[in-house]
Amino acid sequence: MIYNIYIFNKDGTCIYYEDWNKKKQSQNQSEDQKLLFGMLYSLKAFITSSSPKKIDDKTGFHCYKTSTYKLHYYETLSCIKFIIMSDPNVPDLRDDLKKIYSQIFVEYVIKNPIYKHGTTVKCDTFINQLNLYLKQMPSFSS
């Protein structure tokens, strides 16, 4: 089951958030977003500094799992971060995050002449296409 998705710009601002199957609602969504970004920033820095080998896109951090959720992570070359939170039993969604970026975000946000890079995403076509993509996934509501 997929709980929610976050998209952060390179400066750490959450430019898109949506939840579907999240049972516990946040008291302060803005604070949660800052905590999530800070945790990811620190985790990536720790992994990079403690790894005995050079970290790259294929071998770097892409998910972690607790007893209550799994965090799936993809960072683009332009430092846009895509995060999906799911049930811990959902398989790795890294390829799905890459598709969301390349086939949906790039097509309906980046190529949109009205969109200002780094600002909140409000494009209805993007939101509709993202929802269509996620809701057709076997792990969306299972």
Curated annotation (Swiss-Prot):
SMART domains: Sybindin
Top-rank taxon, per record: Eukaryota
Record localization: Golgi apparatus, cis-Golgi network; Endoplasmic reticulum
Cellular component annotations (GO), alphabetically ordered: endoplasmic reticulum; Golgi apparatus; TRAPP complex
InterPro entries xref list: Longin-like_dom_sf (IPR011012), TRAPPC (IPR007233)
Xref: CDD domains: TRAPPC1_MUM2
Principal location class: Golgi
Keywords (A to Z) from UniProt: Endoplasmic reticulum, ER-Golgi transport, Golgi apparatus, Transport
GO BP annotations, alphabetical order: endoplasmic reticulum to Golgi vesicle-mediated transport
Family: Belongs to the TRAPP small subunits family. BET5 subfamily.
Primary role: May play a role in vesicular transport from endoplasmic reticulum to Golgi.
Subunit description: Part of the multisubunit TRAPP (transport protein particle) complex.
Protein name: Trafficking protein particle complex subunit 1
UniProt source species: Dictyostelium discoideum
